[in-house]
């Protein structure tokens, strides 16, 4: 199984890349976390946001392939505790399918992404900067993995 974090946005600050990599590299091969960046649509003062969202969504879905188990990161999703996320990760590992975690851009996710999703995960009721979401997701997935493997990281 491979975890694919599919995010709208490129050229992140170094602290984002370093934070993400710190946790992604700790995960073992059977639970590898890979980042797939999608270029954001060009936003201007009079742009058609729905068209941009649809285009970003189409490119996100194309990046994950047809057989992936899609999970959107969305404020309206389930707010799993760390232990609940560990149980979800254990289920994903048992099922063996690749997982695609979709993080939208500044205007969120397209309807097509939401419709294709098998699950939706909310990190918080608060809104986080999209670059920070990458780091939080990587850390939480690593923490969930350590719980499943009785590693002392999660205490």
Curated annotation (Swiss-Prot):
Keywords: Cytoplasm, Methyltransferase, rRNA processing, S-adenosyl-L-methionine, Transferase. Pfam families: SPOUT_MTase (PF02590). The keyword Cytoplasm applies. Its main location: cytoplasm. It catalyses: pseudouridine(1915) in 23S rRNA + S-adenosyl-L-methionine = N(3)-methylpseudouridine(1915) in 23S rRNA + S-adenosyl-L-homocysteine + H(+). Its EC number is 2.1.1.177. GO terms for cellular component: cytoplasm. InterPro entries: Alpha/beta_knot_MTases (IPR029028), RlmH-like (IPR003742), tRNA_m1G_MTases_N (IPR029026). S-adenosyl-L-methionine binds at residues 73, 104, 123-128. GO terms for molecular function: rRNA (pseudouridine-N3-)-methyltransferase activity. Homodimer. Specifically methylates the pseudouridine at position 1915 (m3Psi1915) in 23S rRNA. This is Ribosomal RNA large subunit methyltransferase H. The gene is rlmH.
